[in-house]
Swiss-Prot record:
Name of the protein described by the UniProt record: 3-isopropylmalate dehydratase large subunit
Biological source species: Buchnera aphidicola subsp. Uroleucon obscurum
This protein's UniProt keywords: 4Fe-4S, Amino-acid biosynthesis, Branched-chain amino acid biosynthesis, Iron, Iron-sulfur, Leucine biosynthesis, Lyase, Metal-binding, Plasmid
Gene3D superfamilies: Aconitase, domain 3
EC number(s) reported in the record: 4.2.1.33
Binding site for [4Fe-4S] cluster: C347, C407, C410
Signal peptide, first to last residue: none
Top-level class of the enzyme under EC nomenclature: lyase
Physiological role: Catalyzes the isomerization between 2-isopropylmalate and 3-isopropylmalate, via the formation of 2-isopropylmaleate.
Gene of this entry: leuC
Length: 443
């Protein structure tokens, strides 16, 4: 029977399944951070349970950490408490932790791929919605809640239902200055932020084949913004080259055996998908969101839509509300709107290729005096590599602050946040109301 990539990975991890297609799935890799794990560990203690597979469980500090100083006291009392609790839990249960003093510390969805923890064919979970990032390697990866974190810690399994299959084929030639982030934002805008609900999305096509692993991670990271369970891209030679000689990658005969298996991880040519879309990006321009939802997006050379001309009453009301919150008028260009902040970072766009691209644009230029801009590398290794290449100097010379790794301004959970009604051009994945701080306006 022909199968999709999703079906192949899912079926190979089923421990048992009932007549309603609800399965117990084996989990290959469990990633933890300081925010969604404390209650899970408390429950383990109360039930006198151990962590089932400590060698398949890794933790890092990222959401709450200060990006200005390596000190757990620097992000407030709640953040300090969560980080102290993570240290205690990892020590007690013998889990590897990349704390703020570890050179490998960083955003969980940046460090796992760069260390070779993320491998094709795996099932990967984390108490974070953008776990879909790891799907770029042909791994079935998705976010889970705190009670599910506890279940995986205790059993190394998870109760799951089967999702439907969606295929998005991206074709054409990538125009100059168009990035992977532009491509996925365009797709979200075209199909809608709920178009993926109930689906796992496989991205394919000649455009995807040409993408680097870091670009593929950006695409899969944003699959959740379509409402999808996860995003997937079949592994290929680009994947294998990226993984070769990583710390946790297979080696020797194990590498050869792994390659034999990984080459099987693709959808069969006659596999059936529940939905299929072909997206041509040949004429695409850089994209930017104007509203408070990722599908409220336009090309940089387009005007904000006139909500009075929108037929759908629901979409019209949403657009009107978004314009009010964002302090914008419809039928105007965003290029005429002044910004207060710039944020380069997040699990979507804080890898070395992202920093290289930004540095090319900023070299020998200065940002406006009134703009406060920060660059937050996705990990200690990204920061080290960027400094080796002199990228930090380019950013600093242009007026940016060069920060320590962390989630930073992606979410208003640490000291890096917008003030009321400040406007930010952001590399992050969400432009929800208040996402970067109360009353903050995110593009």
């Amino acid at each position: 029977m022909s199968k999709t990539l999703y079906q192949k990975i899912y079926d190979s991890h089923v421990v048992c399944e009932d007549k309603n297609n609800t399965s117990i799935l084996y989990i290959d890799l469990h990633l933890l951070h300081e925010v969604t794990s404390p209650q899970a560990f408390d429950s383990l203690r109360n039930k006198k349970r151990k962590v089932r597979q400590v060698n398949k469980t890794f933790a890092t500090m990222d959401h709450n950490v200060s990006t200005q100083i390596k000190n757990i006291n620097a992000s407030g009392s709640m953040a300090k408490k969560q980080m102290e609790q993570l240290i205690k839990n990892c020590q007690e249960f013998n889990i590897s932790l990349y704390d703020i003093n570890n050179p490998n510390q960083g955003i969980v969805h940046v460090i796992a791929p760069e260390k070779g923890m993320t491998l094709p064919g795996m099932t990967i979970v984390c108490g974070d919605s953008h776990t879909s990032t790891h799907g770029a390697f042909g791994a079935l990866s998705f976010g889970i809640g705190t009670s599910e974190v506890e279940h995986v810690l205790a059993t190394q399994t998870l109760k799951q239902k089967r999702f439907k299959n969606m295929k998005i084929e991206i074709v054409g030639e990538i125009p100059k200055f168009v990035t992977a982030k532009d491509i996925i934002l365009f797709i979200i805008g075209k199909l809608g932020s709920s178009s993926g609900t109930g689906y796992v999305i496989e991205f394919c096509g000649n455009v995807v084949k040409k993408m680097s692993m870091e670009e593929r991670m950006t695409v899969c990271n944003m699959a959740i913004e379509m409402g999808a369970k996860s995003g997937l891209i079949a592994p290929d030679e680009i994947t294998y080259e990226y993984l070769k000689n990583k710390m946790y990658s297979p080696y020797g005969i194990f590498w050869k055996n792994s390659l034999d298996y990984w080459r099987f991880l693709k959808s069969d040519s006659d596999a059936q998908f529940d939905k299929y879309f072909t997206i041509d990006i040949s004429n695409l321009a850089p994209q930017i969101t104007w509203g408070t939802n990722p599908d409220q997006v336009i090309s940089i050379n387009e005007k904000i839509p006139d909500y009075n001309k929108i037929d759908s009453l629901v979409k019209k009301d949403a657009a009107k509300s978004a314009c009010k919150y964002m302090g914008l008028r419809s039928d105007t260009y965003l290029t005429n709107i002044s910004i207060d902040r710039v944020f380069i970072g997040s699990c979507t766009n804080a890898r070395i290729e992202d920093l290289r691209s930004a540095s090319v644009i900023l070299k020998n230029k200065k940002i406006a005096n009134h703009v406060k801009a920060i660059v937050v590398p996705g990990s200690g290794l990204v920061k080290k590599q960027a400094e080796k290449e002199g990228l930090d100097k380019i950013f600093i010379d242009s007026g940016f602050e060069w920060r320590l790794p962390g989630c930073s301004m992606c979410l208003g959970m640490n000291k890096d946040r917008l003030n009321f009604q400040e406007r930010c051009a952001s590399h992050s994945n969400r432009n929800f109301e208040g996402r970067q701080g109360r009353g903050g306006r995110t593009h």
